[in-house]
Amino acid sequence: MSKSVYLDAFQEVFVLGMRNWIKFRNFAQILRLTFIPSRMKVLKFGGTSVGSAERISHVARLIVENGKNIVVLSAMAGTTNTLVEINDYLYKRNIPGAQETLNNLEMKYRGVIDELFDNEEARAEAARVLGERFAYIRTIVASEFAVAEEKEILAQGELMSTALMNIYLKLHGVKSVLLPALEYMRTDQNGEPDMKYIATRLRRLLEANRDADVYLTQGYICCNAYGEVDNLKRGGSDYSASLIGAVVDAEEIQIWTDIDGMHNNDPRYVDNTRPVGSLNFEEAAELAYFGAKILHPNCVLPAKLNNIPVRLLNTLDPSATGTVIYNMPPDGKIKAVAAKDNITAIKIKSGRMLLAYGFLHKVFETFEKYQTSIDMIATSEVGVTVTIDSDRHLAAIVDDLKNFGTVTVDRDMVIICVVGDLEWHNTGFEAKAVSALADIPVRAISYGGSNYNVSMVIRGCDKIEALKRLSDSLFE
């Protein structure tokens, strides 16, 4: 009988960051006693939510309706991708390509300004502020491009979206104050949030602006330990909101997107999906890690450790219930199915070495050597299968693993993850999940390492059919 072991990504993050998070909780308690006048909410709006003049105006109304809170904004939809494209041109020394792309982006923003502002003075102010941002990018394009400047270019999207929103709110009589993320959001030498620095700097900014109606700040962007502009990686605006929420001991963290919360399956492929009303933090972390794009995986931990509910809401339908994530007790239910694409499965077969002392340790050391994370691992008496989601160092990894046995590689695989209350005494759920895929080839199954998921590795071409069958079996 084969044995299956699940490498719980959430637990891994928890262990690696615990020392910093313990410090962070202490800072949150200090802040609660010293300067936060009342518990605010942290509202994060993603790129699609502020993707046009019409949507910026709509989000502004939502901001005002929610009262005095901290609002975290992403860049307007498409902006970060365009800035990445500009960086690619600069790496290739294609200056004309970078200039043309930048000009097109500026034209887009000019159109947004013209549509958003009917007041000439506000329109001129917006044009001036955004003009400064585009002029700054042009100085980089015209100079000898350095690697450090890549992140400075990427930061401009959030700086522009918050500038537009700030001007728009003030035009409509709202005392909006910008909290520049580059003045308080910092990572340490390990790339982890610098808790003491964030708490201290953010406290000063809030104290200096006590009478504000609304606090606006940028998601995603930060400075590193050396004072250079950096970021929290794609999707990092959720993480920014969660870190801020923990610092101010927020009443609630709201993540606003263009969908009604976390669905029980992928609505792009499966009909009649429905929002999941509530999840506990562990379930949410599993779904976020294994493919639910609505929430960044790193967002969960700060909220969990500070017991702050996270609510997923729809900008286009604010009255929709959405999903609330909190420390809810186990309820014995399957909550949702998610899929993680672009997985590579690697099998090492070696009957002679597998059971030898230290064999698995050597396998793991290989992946550590190339800084490649493992999503799943399943072992049997004669082989071990691991999955990874990055093939950047695949050739080198495979060469090293050949020292331990025969290596086979399957690319274009998918991890299907069934999430819910899967405590061992809640019998039958895992059987229903596996039997639903009866005639779909399953490369590996992982169950037992987490109380909240059962994961199966299948071919990418079988993903949609697998999602539909699981939906029929588990939710009908």
What are the roles of these predicted feature ranges?
Residues 285-325, 332, 339-347:
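A conserved active-site cap/scaffold subdomain adjacent to cofactor or substrate pockets
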Residues 2-4, 38:
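Serine residues within intrinsically disordered or low-complexity segments
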Residues 321-476:
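A conserved regulatory-domain signal marking ACT and ACT-like small-molecule sensing domains
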Residues 26, 30-295, 300, 459:
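Nucleotide/pyrophosphate-binding catalytic subdomain
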